[in-house]
Amino acid sequence: TNAIDAIMAFGPRLDNLLGCHNFYPQQYTGLGDDRFLAYSQKFRRHGVRTAAFVTAPSADHGPWPVSEGLPTLESDRHRSIASQVHHLRLTEVIDDVLIGNALANEADLKAAALAFFCPYPALRVITDQAPSALEAKIAFSEAHLYRGDASDYLIRDTQPRVRYAGQPLPVHDASGHLQRGDVVVVNETYARYAGELQIVLRELPNDGRRNKIGHLTDEDLTLLPLLKPWRTFMLKQVSH
């Protein structure tokens, strides 16, 4: 990683350079997330395009006679390929994504392409029961902007409460406690805030004013710390 400083000392043309992480066939040998970010910043600091590898669950061929995946990040080894791509996008240090193993099937190639080329990173939400039509529209049909004056308890997108002001959002699934990763829409009993989309960061009591409509998948719950204030993201509805 120190070689990049020596290379840059010669004033190379940046459009002839690409920084690329390694892939790691052996389980438990991939980069940790913090080290990955630190190494990537060396390239970013010089304005060098940077690439990393994901692994295709459908593929089993690599450079060595082992089939334990070929990711750059150890935390990506057992993720779905779409979640791996969104993970790399959320780090904001990677320009290009490569599939390390062969031969990925059509489904994995399509999932990786959709994740890479979609306008914003997306997190998947499991809905135990169907949300109302308006709640589904709020949560899944539009991009969300993480409000900049951020709370320790909630990620807030306040724009839906403006767009859908005055529309009915009756109470349902609004009791007990909310857990990290729960996705809620503020209901009509909280008039000023009705329609606001929120993702729970810390456990808190539900006082009846927030309708729980789903929960982040286990895979994507681990990506929650990478969401930053003032960033735009999307939510995707999935079933169990």
Q: Where on the chain are the PLM-derived regions?
A:
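Catalytic alpha/beta core domains of metabolic enzymes, predominantly
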Residues: 2-129
